Amino acid sequence: MSLLRKKNVDQMIAGAQRAGLKKALGAVDLTFLGIGAIIGTGIFVLTGTGAVQAGPALMVSFIVAAIACGLSALAYAEFASTIPVAGSIYTYSYAALGELVAWIIGWDLMLEYSLAASAVSVGWSGYAQSLLKGFGVVLPTVLTAAPNSVPGVTTYFDLPAFVVMMAITTLLSVGIRESTRVNNLMVFIKVAVVLLVIAVGVFHVTPANWTPFMPHGWSGVFGAAAVMFFAFIGFDAVSSAAEEVKNPKRDLPIGIIASLGVCAVLYVTVAAVATGIVPSSQYAGITHPISYALQVAGQNWVAGFIDLGAVLGMLTVILVMTYGQTRITYAMSRDGLLPAVLSRVHPRFQTPFLATWIIGLLCALIAALIPLNVLAELINIGTLAAFSMVSIAVIVLRRTRPDLPRAFRCPGVPVVPVLAVAACVFLMLNLSAVTWKAFGIWLVIGLVIYFVYSRRNAKIAQGGAQH
């Protein structure tokens, strides 16, 4: 049995066309879907972490992270327009690079989606607590954060993060999916909050706070960029909607690139305002840096709106990431790479009920017990590895299937995909040794599962659907 057996691209596309899903999404819907998935903990919470690490040069860190993401986004856009099939990077790699690589990427995606849902839950917790304090409700300190996450403060369990994660799991398990209209409304709220920060904050910027601009040198800038990469994760969620798009070959690339571009501009501007209002070193240990900056500026009413907007806006990110995790698990189980029980559908709710609850409970415990900075780095290394693979896959599919119609072509192949791989690997090298060790352990576990179970049980081995 070949480790590189592939799914047939033509059969995949034909199967997607027979699926009968309602094709209702356009370019604007996809752009909003992307922005909805991107804007979350990265900007509302990790801005403080990045500011401590890079200083005012956090603006440069965002640009570096955006370039790395943008190069990968071009590769994503080509795949999304060529193979408009649900499943995103896992499906693309199964067609272009073969089963073993698809397994590794799927295993990486499971890490990305589950930890991203947990990380956003932690971010949500910080803003929810800040909002509750405005109404005089204060939780016991030991239940406000994961152990060792707040310097000098004894904490054991992040209760709000656990509760919100379980609430989202309950909704998903009974089949409540966010509609495009609700998602667009939440995106509007999040973008409005970010614009409010910029509009009010710009009048309270003290240029002296931008000096020194790069207090920790380029190592601080690149280290922060490796963490802030998390702020852009989510544009890949656009491609998972491929089978429900009216004109996927045109609209998917627009949705991917437009959502990333809008968020990059907003992030750099917010970083400039936040580090201009508060000296970057003062963000250490702050779990709600954006509203904190406005509180320092004396704009408590604006800070309250930011807390509310962040709480509402991050709910959609938790939902999208948790749903994405259940979808990738379901797809891999359906392909035979994971046990069939994980793709079993509830007879009443028509959802992968057991898989949703297993994933939800694990994510809730992770959110309650692991500090945010640790989660962010682990998410980033898995995602950067997966993005590198999709860039390589573009080059491979160009050579192996030059006949496939490509509505969008990644420019400068193979140079641009090679640059994307180089940028992703460079950011990976700026992550901590502990993160690399944890990622290595995760990969080893995944490979053991593949060789012991998945390789023998893969549906493709039974059906011989190779190209």
Q: How would you describe each model-predicted region?
A:
Residues 22, 45-150, 259-262, 269, ...:
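Extracellular loop-to-transmembrane helix junctions
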Residues 21, 153-157, 168, 215, ...:
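C-terminal membrane-solvent junction of multi-pass transporters and transport-like membrane proteins
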Residues 130, 193-197, 329, 379-406, ...:
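Hydrophobic alpha-helical segments of multi-pass membrane transport proteins
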Residues 44, 108-123, 227, 232, ...:
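Membrane-helix boundary/coupling elements in multi-pass transport proteins
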Residues 14-21, 58-59, 63, 137-163, ...:
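Helix-loop-helix junctions that connect adjacent transmembrane segments
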